[in-house]
Structures are given as C-alpha cells and as structure tokens.
C-alpha cells in the first residue's frame, strides 16, 4: 500500500509540475518575443523595466525554476528538492498575499502615482518611440484618449485616439475595466493560490510518504 501510494503521488506531482513547466516555457518565450520586438513600449518612464516583456520573462522564469524542482524532486524522490519546491511555493504565496494587502492599503497613493506617471509619459509621446508605442497600444485597445481626455494632447490627439466627443481618458477607462472584471480577476487569483497550496500539499505528502516507505524498508 505504501509503495503504490508513493508511486501515485510521485507521478501526480510530476505531471502537475511538467504542465506548469511547459506553461512557464511558453510565457518566457512570449516575454522574449515582446522584448525583442518592443511591441508595447514603455508606459512609465520612471519605471522603464516595467514592461509586458520583462514581466512575462520574470514570471515565466520563476514558473520554470519552481516546476523543474517539483519535477525532479518527485521523479527522483529527492527530499531536498521537494522541500526546496515547497519553500519556494510558500515564499511566492506569502509574497502574493503581501502585495495584495499593500495594494489594498495604499490604493489611493497608488492611484496618484499611476496618474502622475501617465501624465509624465504623455509629455514624451513625440520624443520617445517606446512611449509612443505604449500609448498607441493602450488607446487602441481600450478605445480611450489621453490620461483624462483628448485635451491632454496639447498638440492635438494622435491617430490612435478614437474620434468622438464622449471618449473617456485612459486612466478612468482602465479603472472601469478593472472594476468591471474584478470578479474574474479575483477568481483567477484564488485559483492560482489554490494550485500553489495543492502543489505544496503534494510535495509535503510525498516527502512524508518517502520517509514512511524508507522506514518500512529499513533504509
């Protein structure tokens, strides 16, 4: 019974992490592509590293490293790798909870910083190609114009701005989009946390099962 439980846990955890490793590779690949193509540009000039490409590369790399530890730890029945996998998942989970709390506590300050960053970047639209790409992408996708409206463009709105007198500014449009999709964002966030907790549970259970099997075999 002990050996069959060990094998089942081992392969469940291996397949679980293999799927996430493949997902990590895909995310990393998209991130590298966006970095090379510089498709979406830089929106916040005071945070030049905060681009879609960089975020995807970091997230993809973290997923790949954690999933690799989980794969190798489970298939090799290596307690050290399994505990490393467990600890990394725990650190990531705690970091996510901390970030969520900070975002909630400092929501007003964050809103102010975002508005200031957008107002600053819009001044460099014509002088910085990367900023131009970022603004063109956002205005096209959200069907908005400027930070608070088309009047933000002192020299006239660019072609990426939709026409019409009732066009919203991108700051309020982005906030509206976030609030209208808050339920879906919350569900996705909860699912990610549940998956992480499941991964930690599998790793800890497999680690304990390895101990029990070793004791039963007299190792």
Swiss-Prot record:
Membrane topology (UniProt): Multi-pass membrane protein
Transmembrane parts of this sequence: 12-32, 55-69, 81-106, 182-206
Keywords: Cell junction, Cell membrane, Glycoprotein, Membrane, Transmembrane, Transmembrane helix
Residue intervals annotated with topology Extracellular: 33-54, 107-181
Glycosylation site positions: 119, 129, 148
Leader peptide range in chain numbering: none
Induction: Expression rapidly increases in hematopoietic stem cells during stress.
Cytoplasmic side: 1-11, 70-80, 207-219
One cellular-component annotation, GO: cell-cell junction
Places the protein is found: Cell membrane; Cell junction; Membrane
Source species, domain of life: Eukaryota
A molecular function (GO) term: identical protein binding
InterPro entries: Tetraspanin/Peripherin, Tetraspanin_animals, Tetraspanin_CS, Tetraspanin_EC2_sf
Traits of the deletion mutant: Lymph nodes of cd53-deleted mice are smaller than wild-type mice due to a marked reduction in B-cells and T-cells. Cd53-deleted B-cell progenitors have diminished IL-7 signal transduction resulting in altered gene expression and increased apoptosis of developing B cells. Mice have largely normal hematopoietic stem cells under homeostatic conditions but they display a prolonged cycling in response to stress. Cd53-deficient myeloid cells have also a reduced capacity to undergo transendothelial migration.
GO biological process, one term: receptor clustering
Subunit organization: Interacts with SCIMP. Interacts with CD45/PTPRC. Interacts with IL7R. Interacts with RBL2 and PPP2CA.
Family, as annotated: Belongs to the tetraspanin (TM4SF) family.
Protein's job: Structural component of specialized membrane microdomains known as tetraspanin-enriched microdomains (TERMs), which act as platforms for receptor clustering and signaling. Participates thereby in diverse biological functions such as cell signal transduction, adhesion, migration and protein trafficking. Plays a role in the activation of monocytes and B-cells. Acts as an essential regulator of B-cell development by promoting interleukin-7 receptor/IL7R signaling. Also promotes, in B-cells, the BCR signaling by recruiting PKC to the plasma membrane in order to phosphorylate its substrates.
Name of this chain's protein: Leukocyte surface antigen CD53
Source species: Mus musculus (Mouse)
Taxonomic classification: Eukaryota, Metazoa, Chordata, Craniata, Vertebrata
